[in-house]
């Protein structure tokens, strides 16, 4: 019986680790998607303002440039998105 219990506990631990990995990957992809949507909104706003006024908005262009600077990828550092 203890052998079966050990196998059951090991299976639960493996399932927990797999769940954590999957949800972490999903969270990272979600953050990338949110970031891309923000960039697309800024790009669209800059384009609309450029059409209306004939020149680009400086503040929006600077914000878009700041979003483009990601930096080095460090696995495990979730704030590096």
From Swiss-Prot:
Cross-referenced InterPro entries, in alphabetical order? Answer: Vpu (IPR008187), Vpu_cyt_dom_sf (IPR009032)
Q: Membrane-spanning regions, if any?
A: 8-28
- At the top level, the lineage of the source is Viruses
Which HAMAP family did the record assign? HIV_VPU
Protein family (similarity comment)? Belongs to the HIV-1 VPU protein family.
**Other observations noted:** HIV-1 lineages are divided in three main groups, M (for Major), O (for Outlier), and N (for New, or Non-M, Non-O). The vast majority of strains found worldwide belong to the group M. Group O seems to be endemic to and largely confined to Cameroon and neighboring countries in West Central Africa, where these viruses represent a small minority of HIV-1 strains. The group N is represented by a limited number of isolates from Cameroonian persons. The group M is further subdivided in 9 clades or subtypes (A to D, F to H, J and K).
Whom does it interact with, and what assembly results?
A: Homopentamer. Interacts with host CD4 and BRTC; these interactions induce proteasomal degradation of CD4. Interacts with host BST2; this interaction leads to the degradation of host BST2. Interacts with host FBXW11. Interacts with host AP1M1; this interaction plays a role in the mistrafficking and subsequent degradation of host BST2. Interacts with host RANBP2; this interaction allows Vpu to down-regulate host BLM sumoylation.
What is the name of the protein in this document? Answer: Protein Vpu
- What is the organism field in this record? Human immunodeficiency virus type 1 group M subtype F1 (isolate 93BR020)
Lineage, highest ranks first: Viruses, Riboviria, Pararnavirae, Artverviricota, Revtraviricetes
């Amino acid at each position: 019986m203890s052998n079966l219990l050990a196998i059951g506990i090991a299976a639960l631990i493996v399932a927990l680790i797999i769940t954590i990995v999957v949800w972490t990957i999903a969270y990272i992809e979600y953050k990338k998607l949110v970031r891309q949507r923000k960039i697309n909104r800024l790009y669209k706003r800059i384009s609309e303002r450029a059409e209306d006024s004939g020149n680009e908005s400086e503040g929006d262009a600077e914000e878009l440039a700041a979003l483009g600077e990601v930096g080095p990828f460090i696995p495990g550092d979730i704030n590096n998105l």
